[in-house]
């Protein structure tokens, strides 16, 4: 028998998958498999009378232990067994070739299969046929009775899913992988199944525990059936260690057992062998977009849309699906600030990652955010931010050196809660380059040049906080005069960032397994999932990256000064869900890039008019209503007295100027004003 080589996905070429195989084909597969086993364990009855029989435990027809030279002693005479072994191997090869011909695959795929792969695929198709008759057939009959019209033939219903279909037994044995899996994983179904007949052959070893825990729990009882469950795992389709890192694919599994526990108990009671038919778990698998596959997955996927933004995150372009999900036309989105749609809880993290992209002019980052559509509904998005060079000219004739491309993947509440419980995905180092270079795009002037991440943080100028514009649809109250919205600003000093702590953790430090969620955690359909899942969220701290000089790094961390803020935050400040964020930003750089995008004049004008009415009796107050420099640079004459006055009276306004029954927009604006 020819020696089998290790299985590699590169050993195959793509091809179309044939039909699933009928009853006759499955019976023929079983018949060939039986003959292969009979040939392996035979005692040489097919040989002539002069041949020497090999014991039954000699599995592959090789000579016995005492005859390594291919001979054996019978009645004192030495006879050769090489001919018997070769004939037995030829019989096995013939039966395996019959199995190969019966597989419902294309000829191009069959010709590239090794013998071990033929046996593995044969087991998968035989197991699939067996479960179709016992477990799946009653479910199909029930679905056909519920349907008013029969399902047309030749239609692939998996195209309507947000991912590919996967069916496994409770022990992890693969029953079915839908044909559209190649569109998401980049490998044909045959290549995926040839990795092994178990799901654990495809899943990364660090996630074996999470997958096993989900499958081992078994189907629920009829009282709670069905029970949807969502979990994340990493699929690793490369068998070589050198290719594992770049071929990791984060996949979001959402599925359930297709029958309650009572069904399998009754089914196994009718069989002579206990646990003959295991429960079947069916799930559709949705790969998460990443900087490598985001552009490819956005094509033809109705749950992925893309947008383009200027460096201040104002919309430049949007595709058709963006208008469909957000409720705005392309013309309405152009020029609109992206920060005006984001939930305030996500502003600190997004502002920090946005600043990194604007600083380095390269790289990509991931984020889990909520955007508000035109109808006021919040939608969860798994987003990839990438900055790319650009040669276009704007309306003023100036060249747009860089454009930020965003790819958004829409999620359900349960999927978003699962990703929130696995927030380490959004702080992995592979989502952002470890080596930076800013030589490809010099800024037009030195005044607007962002500093390097190694630049010491500012200690004299605290970060600027300006009032955020109101929620979509909230206009200016009648009677307010048109004033310059750049006149009122609030400064809050914060602790400088520690440059010794890495911004993103390396991929190798990711957890050994992922967290999962069930529908039982969401008792109400409209309940906010993260409000009841705070106890399972991981720590927000980021551990330093320890290299060779461990003692030196620890000594630098211990000696780094930790300056306490000069003024405490108001009681209504909410800094939840910060996702391992640093505690401070560089004020000047943050204000340069986020000032024009974050803040609009409407809401600030309301606060300015309110403060003018309250303090008309104080003409000698230090606050002077004079124009200030443009939004691209912070005010130069903004002193400590201005901060004390604005901090005090803005607090009074936020605490005492609320209506008896606060409206949703007021709550949003109060949180937005302090979000950064």
Curated annotation (Swiss-Prot):
Q: What InterPro entries would the database entry show? A: bHLH_dom (IPR011598), bHLH_NPAS4 (IPR056192), HLH_DNA-bd_sf (IPR036638), PAS (IPR000014), PAS-like_dom_sf (IPR035965)
Keyword Repeat (UniProt): no
Ranges for the region named Basic motif are: 76-89
What does the entry list under GO cellular component?
A: nucleus; RNA polymerase II transcription regulator complex
| Gene that encodes the chain | cky-1
The name on file for this protein is: PAS domain-containing protein cky-1
Q: Where is this region: Disordered?
A: 45-89, 436-462
Q: What is its main location?
A: nucleus
Q: Where is the composition biased (Polar residues)?
A: 73-84
Q: Which domain of life is it from?
A: Eukaryota
What are the PAS domain coordinates in residue numbering?
A: 165-215
């Amino acid at each position: 028998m020819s020696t089998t080589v290790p299985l590699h996905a590169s050993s195959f070429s793509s091809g179309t998958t044939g039909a699933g195989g009928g009853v006759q084909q499955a019976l023929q597969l079983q018949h060939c498999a039986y003959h292969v086993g009979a040939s392996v364990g035979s005692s040489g009855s097919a040989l002539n009378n002069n041949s020497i029989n090999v014991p039954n435990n000699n599995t592959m027809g090789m000579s016995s232990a005492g005859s390594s030279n291919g001979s054996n002693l019978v009645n004192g005479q030495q006879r050769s067994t090489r001919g018997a072994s070769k004939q037995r191997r030829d019989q096995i090869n013939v039966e395996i070739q019959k199995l190969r011909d019966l597989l419902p695959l294309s000829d191009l795929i069959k010709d590239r299969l090794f013998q071990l792969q033929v046996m593995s695929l044969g087991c998968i198709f035989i197991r699939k046929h067996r479960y179709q008759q016992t477990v799946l057939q009653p479910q199909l009959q029930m679905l056909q009775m519920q349907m008013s019209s029969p399902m047309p033939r030749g239609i692939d219903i998996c195209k309507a899913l947000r991912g590919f279909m996967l069916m496994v037994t409770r022990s992890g044995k693969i029953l079915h992988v839908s044909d559209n899996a190649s569109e998401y994983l980049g490998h044909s179904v045959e290549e995926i199944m040839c990795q092994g007949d178990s799901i654990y052959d495809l899943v990364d070893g660090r996630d074996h525990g999470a997958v096993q825990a989900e499958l081992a729990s078994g189907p629920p009882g009829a009282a709670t059936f069905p029970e949807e469950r969502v979990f994340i795992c990493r699929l690793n389709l490369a068998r070589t260690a050198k290719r594992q890192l770049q071929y990791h694919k984060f996949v979001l599994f959402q599925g359930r057992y297709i029958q309650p526990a009572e069904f399998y108990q009754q089914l196994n009671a009718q069989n002579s062998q206990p646990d003959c038919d295991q429960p079947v778990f069916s799930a559709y698998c949705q790969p998460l977009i990443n900087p490598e596959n985001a552009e490819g997955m956005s094509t033809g996927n109705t749950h992925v849309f893309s947008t383009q933004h200027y460096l201040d995150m104002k919309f430049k372009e949007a595709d058709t699906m963006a208008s469909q999900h957000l409720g705005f036309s392309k013309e309405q989105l152009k020029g609109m600030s992206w920060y005006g749609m984001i939930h305030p809880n996500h502003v600190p993290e997004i502002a920090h990652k946005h600043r990194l992209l604007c600083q380095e002019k390269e790289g990509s980052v991931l984020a889990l955010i909520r955007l508000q559509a035109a109808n006021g509904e919040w939608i969860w998005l798994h987003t990839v931010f990438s900055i790319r060079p650009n040669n276009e000219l704007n309306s003023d004739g100036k060249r747009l050196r860089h454009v930020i491309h965003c790819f958004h993947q829409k999620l359900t509440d349960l999927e978003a809660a699962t990703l929130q419980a696995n927030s380490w995905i959004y702080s992995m180092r592979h989502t952002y380059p470890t080596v930076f270079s800013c030589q490809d795009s010099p800024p037009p002037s030195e005044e607007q040049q962002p500093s390097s991440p190694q630049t010491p943080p500012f200690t004299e100028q605290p970060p600027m906080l300006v009032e955020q514009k109101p929620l979509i649809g909230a206009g200016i109250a009648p009677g307010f005069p048109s004033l310059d919205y750049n006149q009122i600003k609030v400064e809050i000093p914060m602790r400088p960032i520690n440059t010794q702590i890495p911004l993103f953790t390396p991929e190798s430090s990711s957890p050994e397994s992922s967290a999962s969620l069930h529908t039982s955690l969401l008792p109400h359909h409209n309940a906010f999932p993260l409000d009841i899942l705070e106890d399972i969220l991981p720590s927000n701290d980021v551990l330093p990256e320890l290299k060779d000089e461990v003692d030196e790094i620890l000594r630098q961390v211990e000696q780094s000064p930790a300056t306490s803020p000069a003024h405490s935050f108001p009681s209504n400040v909410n800094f939840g869900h910060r996702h391992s964020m640093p505690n401070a930003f560089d004020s000047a750089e943050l204000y340069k890039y986020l000032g024009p995008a974050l803040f609009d004049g409407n809401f600030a004008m309301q606060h300015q008019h309110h403060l003018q009415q309250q303090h008309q009796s104080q003409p000698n107050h230090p606050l002077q209503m004079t124009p200030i420099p443009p939004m691209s640079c912070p005010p130069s004459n903004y002193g400590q007295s201005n901060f004390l006055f604005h901090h005090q009276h803005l607090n009074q306004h936020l605490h005492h100027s609320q209506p008896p029954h606060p409206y949703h927009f007021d709550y949003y604006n109060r949180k937005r004003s302090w979000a950064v």
